[in-house]
Amino acid sequence: MPRFVDRVVIHARAGSGGNGCASVHREKFKPLGGPDGGNGGRGGSIVFVVDPQVHTLLDFHFHPHISAPSGKQGMGNNRDGAAGADLEVKVPDGTVVLDENGRLLADLVGAGTRFEAAAGGRGGLGNAALASRARKAPGFALLGEPGETRELTLELKTVADVGLIGFPSAGKSSLVSAISAAKPKIADYPFTTLVPNLGVVSAGEHTFTVADVPGLIPGASAGRGLGLDFLRHIERCAVLVHVIDCATADPGRDPISDIDALEAELAAYTPTLQGDVTLGDLTERPRAVVLNKIDVPEARELAEFVRDEIAERGWPVFLVSTVAREGLQPLIFGLWQMISEYQSAQPEIVPRRPVIRPVPVDDSGFRVEPDPRQPGAFVVSGARPERWVRQTNFDNDEAVGYLADRLARLGVEEELLRLGARPGCAVTIGDMTFDWEPQTPAGQQVVLSGRGTDARLERTERVGAAERKAARRQRRTGDDAERGTTERGENT
């Protein structure tokens, strides 16, 4: 059973909003009590929270499906449904959240950092909230909006100040155990280290963290060995340290060629966090070289021979023996100095100020386009019309009429006519496809009909904007004529 998991794919589903309630107040001695249906509760959201006590993504490996509770349905007597509680999911420090396309959504660093991974759906309005002068007692309510569903990739990138990189069996784990209290697995065979090991190092009054990652081999950036899976753990490191085995007996290997091979892998690796200005490219990080295993006479001689050649690259060189504990103190204080210089040279992070961009006044909020998959059909896109369709109960004619009114006021019907839509053509809004009938009069005064029905849906003639204007003028003329007749009768 794996104990360390640093990459998982999870399925997050936020809670749906509760449905609104369609209810009429009934009480003794209170006729015409009016609508009293409450609103549905908001669905719970899924929120990632950094917990310093969590160090792996193992829990997500066994439970990749995460669901937040939904909101409760509204009830009569103006009682709103309870909102679904937000689900707070604990993640390790250094977790990176990617969407299904690999796009970076959040970089969670620091205890208590929060990120809303999936937003809960809004609750539907009850008929009490939908009542108006034209529709005094609606016989319908709006449905709750479905919660957001997302497929996310979580990657754990170790938060450490120093990253130790080197070939397998170079002595990286031994070095971590020698300069810190960490106790990684140490053995005399390659790839002993299968997971990153962290150690806390004391440099006088200061402390810093060191990460030991599995050994790299040529081609690690392309997926060979374990390097591709664990190179991400050095992305956050301020200083990279090449740990070189000066006592290796492998043919064709020497300290210079090992350093060149490691540098080639760093240059070929593309960090996920490349957009973070505080990190920069891996090849731009400060680097040091540790020539290890100098307790072997031949290794010490080789280290002394190549020391000046490596120093010409501008990197500090340390001769170390973890067995004899030689050269550890100069290494520790040298690394702390490099960390301090790197951090002081980084630009100060300025907190981002929230920017509010109001929707332009002339923005209709929707777009009508021909459907490329079906000639003669149209697609209506936009946040508002798509949300309205999701919240409509199509088993209720009055709710369908209300949707038609909203779309007409938004201008969808007029835009379809302008683009040449014909009766019976398919119109898709969100996940719903309609057979558009322009004869259905929308946007006019609601006529009296039974609750849950809409008499306009039974008519076959379409009433346009000009006809509605003429009807209002005729009603005003009729009212004026009736008022004049009444006044003449009173004078007589």
From Swiss-Prot:
Subunit architecture: Monomer.
Residue ranges of every copy of the OBG-type G domain listed in the record: 160-340
A cellular component term, taken from the record's GO annotations: cytoplasm
Ranges of Basic and acidic residues composition bias in the record: 453-469, 476-492
GO biological process, one term: ribosome biogenesis
Signal sequence bounds: none
Subcellular locations according to the entry: Cytoplasm
Enzyme Commission no: 3.6.5.-
Obg domain residues: 2-159
Binding site for Mg(2+): S173, T193
Enzyme class: hydrolase
InterPro entries: G_OBG, GTP-bd, GTP-bd_Obg/CgtA, GTP-bd_prot_GTP1/OBG_C_sf, GTP1-OBG_CS, GTP1_OBG_dom, GTP1_OBG_dom_sf, OBG_GTPase
Domain named OCT: residues: 358-438
UniProt function note: An essential GTPase which binds GTP, GDP and possibly (p)ppGpp with moderate affinity, with high nucleotide exchange rates and a fairly low GTP hydrolysis rate. Plays a role in control of the cell cycle, stress response, ribosome biogenesis and in those bacteria that undergo differentiation, in morphogenesis control.
Keywords: Cytoplasm, GTP-binding, Hydrolase, Magnesium, Metal-binding, Nucleotide-binding
The keyword Magnesium belongs to this UniProt entry's keyword annotation: yes
Family statement: Belongs to the TRAFAC class OBG-HflX-like GTPase superfamily. OBG GTPase family.
PROSITE patterns: G_OBG, GTP1_OBG, OBG, OCT
The protein, known as: GTPase Obg
Cross-referenced SUPFAM superfamilies: Obg GTP-binding protein C-terminal domain, Obg GTP-binding protein N-terminal domain, P-loop containing nucleoside triphosphate hydrolases
Co-factor requirement: Mg(2+)
Chain spans, region Disordered: 441-492
